[in-house]
A protein has these predicted regions:
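Short beta-strand-turn/beta-hairpin segments enriched in glycine/proline and small hydrophobics
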Residues: 1-5, 96-113
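Surface-exposed patches in structured soluble domains
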Residues: 11-14, 20-26, 104, 109-135
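Structured, soluble extracytoplasmic/luminal domains of envelope-associated proteins
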Residues: 19-30, 40, 52
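Alpha-helical coiled-coil segments
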Residues: 34-103, 121
Length: 135
């Protein structure tokens, strides 16, 4: 029995009953619009956080020099270190969010897990399905 990892609306069914399929053959596609939008948002968020992390690295490097010269206090240097650490954590979180968005986008395409023959079909084009429900 084949099921989808995610729920959604069936956009296209590429096989009929009786069709023989190879492992990895595309069986159906779910509507990808929301998954694609989430993927784009995750990528842009990561891009933004990488820029902020680079700026925080630059500020941290400058703050160490300024601290050694006695121009800024230890407290100011520590605040800049904290801002760097926050930017680093946000970037890591954004990378995880992007990986999740990629997985969900990939899951909009349902493929055959093994070679075989399509014996039954429980869904139709345009139908909304839930995750893990037999297709």
């Amino acid at each position: 029995m084949i099921s989808s990892e995610i729920g959604g609306t069936i956009e296209e069914i590429l096989v009929d009953m009786g069709d023989k399929v190879n492992k990895g053959a595309v069986l159906l596609r779910l509507d990808q619009r929301e998954a694609k939008l989430n993927l784009e948002i995750a990528q842009k968020t990561l891009d933004k956080n990488r820029v902020q992390l680079q700026e925080a690295r630059n500020n941290l490097r400058r703050s160490k020099d300024l601290f050694e010269k006695g121009i800024i206090s230890a407290s100011e240097r520590d605040n800049i270190q904290t801002q760097h650490d926050i930017a680093d954590a946000q970037t890591a979180q954004s990378e995880s969010a992007l990986n999740l968005a990629k997985k969900k986008f990939e899951d909009t395409i349902v493929t055959a897990p093994i070679p075989g023959e399509i014996k039954k079909r429980h869904v139709s084009k345009g139908e909304s399905i839930k995750d893990k429900v037999p297709l």
